[in-house]
């Protein structure tokens, strides 16, 4: 803001970081302060698949809405593919109900034999019954665990996605700490909607956000290097001399 106030255009400013999940905190502040930005070689934090999935589970608990339902009903796989979803959509239109209610009503239908539909409904009902009494951070951790979502990511070996979920949990915890008594699930979901619907008018005068890897061979007038702390940069995965050398090379790229 100080630089911009002195006449520097946003596009001359670049923020570098070691790992993608760092962007969450930077993005939240930039959005709050109305600083335009663009992420290079990465997806905005709240638009990442695993973040959208996690938030869809929370929305399903609170609202049981169709968009959230379609996003996670078969993630992880529950054998609820296109044919069964089409059946639910037709039923929902005919009976003017939500897809979730359509599924709940038809659990005994032959079409859902051999699926995990009943377990899915039981899971959501279990959380929906008492979510208002639980902390959002605890709710999030529990649903990601009990739904099998985190296990699915571990099985796939998606460490970056797990790191992003850990960052989401941290952001929920920070949100609770700042809101105190007012931190209801509904309140949080409307707060987070501000970040997920961020399609501000596109003008190219934006601060660039990118990893140090992406910045190799590039130069910018103003560079901010953030989160240079032990465990982030150098990465917590640095357990050999060779890996530490690689971290040093990356730091050199960032500085030069």
Could you tell me what each predicted segment is?
Residues 1-68, 155, 159-160, 207, ...:
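Conserved motor-region signature of P-loop NTPase helicases/translocases
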Residues 1-12, 94-107:
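Coupling/hinge elements of helicase-like and P-loop NTPase modules
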Residues 2-6, 29-36, 57-60, 64, ...:
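Conserved, well-folded catalytic cores of nucleic-acid-processing
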Residues 68, 76, 105-214, 218-219, ...:
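Accessory C-terminal helicase-associated subdomains
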Residues 86-92:
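C-terminal helical "lid" of AAA+/P-loop NTPase domains
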Residues 222-224:
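Structural motif
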Residues 227-256:
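C-terminal accessory regions
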């Amino acid at each position: 803001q100080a630089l911009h106030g002195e006449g520097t255009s946003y596009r001359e400013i670049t923020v570098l970081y070691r790992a993608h999940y760092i962007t969450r905190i930077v993005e939240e502040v930039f959005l709050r302060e109305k600083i335009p930005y663009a992420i290079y070689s990465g997806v905005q934090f709240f638009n990442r698949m695993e973040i959208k999935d996690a938030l869809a589970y929370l929305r399903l608990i609170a609202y049981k809405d169709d968009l959230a339902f379609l996003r996670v009903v078969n993630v992880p796989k529950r054998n609820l593919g296109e044919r069964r979803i089409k059946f639910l959509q037709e039923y929902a239109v005919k009976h003017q109900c939500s897809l979730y209610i359509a599924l709940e009503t038809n659990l005994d239908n032959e079409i859902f034999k051999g699926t995990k539909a009943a377990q899915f409904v039981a899971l959501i009902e279990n959380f929906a019954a008492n979510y208002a009494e639980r902390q959002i951070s605890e709710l999030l951790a529990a649903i990601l665990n009990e739904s099998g979502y985190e296990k699915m990511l571990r099985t796939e070996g998606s460490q970056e996605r797990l790191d992003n979920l850990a960052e989401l949990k941290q952001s929920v915890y920070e949100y609770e700490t700042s809101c105190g008594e007012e931190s209801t699930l509904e309140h949080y979901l409307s707060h987070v909607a501000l970040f997920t619907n961020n399609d501000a008018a596109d003008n190219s005068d934006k601060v660039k956000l990118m990893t140090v890897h992406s910045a190799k061979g590039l130069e910018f007038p103003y560079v901010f290097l953030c989160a240079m702390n032990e465990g982030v940069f150098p990465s917590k995965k640095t357990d050999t001399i060779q890996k530490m050398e690689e971290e040093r090379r990356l730091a050199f790229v960032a500085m030069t």
